[in-house]
């Protein structure tokens, strides 16, 4: 799919490194628990490295990776891509300009959509602490990085509470089988019903129907309300076909043939993503709050939860002269600055992820550039 020659295709990272140095740098996107060993080996083999977040699963492994980078002289860069979005660049610029006055409090929320939570943290690779990292690290190290970047201070005090409230056996609908494909009596009423998420891609189409671009928003609504007409239009206008015959995330993570409904259904019948969300081996939290105090007296709350109708981050920064409100979501991205003295409002809008079809609101491309 990516035009990689067969000689440079490998089953695992060990085979890739054992093949000898074939490039100047590696992009290490292995699973969290593999970061330490693969990163150490790659730097010792002479590669510069862009490492997917989080750096590692423990503090000792993180420090070992950093020390190895220093010892080998290799460049080590972490994929905190949100710093490179136009949205968060603007937030940072407004803070540093002094327009908000003294920063008093920041309320930052990571609203993980209900189907993303089910896909990644209930059915998927980050569901269990024994095989991956805590959700606050796996999902919110982006946000913690942003807070340090905004404030240029290190937190001095913090506390945190959270738990797994919903995705448990006791919340299963009466008669719910182990798999959604085994005749679940709650198929029509359960928002986590796997065929609706992966075969019909309803949550993705709903997100597109909320896009800020009116043309994209209208077509998203058409795919939901008149799927037959939308499919016919998609054949005439190829860019629209990417939605009517959707094969992107999360569908493309459960099978090697995401264009095939048959392959997707087979994955749901046999793989982890067809499991009932109430009958999985998940043990990570589905909501958590972190409270922080910084040396200057600034207080910060970071809230993360996996029950949002819409994926994205919301932000409120209260200063002595103005309040900043922001929304950075799959469908919309905007910032407002409300000035205390004049009552004036400055509003900035940005292309959303769906508007520009770019990962992390343009942050992925921004980091690589």
Please provide the spans of the model-predicted regions.
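C-terminal helical cap and adjacent loop that interface with cofactors, partners, or active-site loops
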Residues: 1-3, 247, 251-262, 270-369
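Rossmann-fold dehydrogenase core element
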Residues: 64-81, 101-108
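Non-transmembrane alpha-helical segments in soluble domains
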Residues: 1, 14-17, 40, 66, ...
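A structural signal for well-ordered alpha-helical segments within the folded catalytic domains
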Residues: 36-40, 63, 85, 89, ...
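Hydrophobic residues in well-ordered beta-strands that form the structural core
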Residues: 28, 51-52, 78, 107, ...
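Predominantly a Rossmann-like dinucleotide-binding segment in NAD(P)-dependent oxidoreductases
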Residues: 82-267, 273
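Beta-loop-alpha module in the N-terminal Rossmann-like domain of NAD(P)-dependent dehydrogenases
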Residues: 5-68
């Amino acid at each position: 799919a990516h035009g990689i020659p067969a000689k440079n295709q490998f089953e695992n990272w060990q085979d890739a490194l054992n093949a000898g140095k074939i490039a100047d740098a590696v992009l290490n996107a292995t699973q969290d628990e593999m970061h330490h060993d693969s990163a150490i080996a790659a730097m010792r083999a002479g590669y510069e490295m862009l490492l997917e977040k989080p750096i590692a699963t423990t503090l000792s492994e993180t420090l070992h990776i950093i020390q190895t980078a220093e010892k080998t002289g290799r460049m080590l860069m972490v994929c905190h891509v949100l710093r490179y979005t136009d949205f968060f660049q603007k937030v940072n610029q407004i803070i540093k300009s002094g327009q908000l006055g003294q920063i008093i409090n920041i309320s930052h929320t990571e609203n993980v959509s209900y189907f993303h939570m089910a896909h990644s943290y209930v059915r998927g690779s980050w569901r269990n602490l024994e095989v991956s990292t805590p959700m606050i690290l796996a999902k919110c190290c982006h946000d913690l990085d942003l807070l340090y970047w905004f404030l240029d201070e290190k937190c001095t005090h913090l506390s945190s509470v959270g738990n797994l409230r919903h995705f448990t056996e006791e919340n299963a609908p009466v008669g719910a089988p182990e798999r959604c494909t085994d005749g679940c009596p709650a198929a029509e009423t359960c928002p986590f019903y796997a065929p609706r998420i992966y075969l019909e891609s309803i949550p993705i189409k709903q997100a597109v129907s909320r896009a800020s671009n009116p043309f994209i928003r209208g077509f998203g609504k058409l795919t939901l309300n008149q799927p037959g007409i939308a499919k016919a239009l998609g054949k005439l206008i190829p860019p629209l076909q990417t939605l009517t015959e959707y094969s992107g995330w999360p569908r493309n993570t459960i099978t090697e043939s995401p264009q095939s409904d048959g392959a997707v259904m087979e994955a749901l019948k046999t793989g982890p993503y067809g499991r009932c969300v109430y009958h999985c081996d998940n043990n990570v939290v589905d909501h958590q709050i972190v409270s922080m105090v910084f040396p200057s007296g600034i207080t910060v709350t970071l809230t993360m939860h996996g029950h949002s109708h819409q994926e994205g981050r919301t932000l409120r920064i209260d200063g002595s002269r103005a309040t900043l409100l922001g929304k950075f979501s799959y469908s919309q991205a905007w910032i407002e600055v409300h000035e205390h003295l004049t009552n004036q409002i400055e509003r900035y809008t940005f292309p959303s992820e769906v508007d520009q079809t770019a990962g992390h609101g343009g942050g992925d491309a921004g980091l690589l550039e």
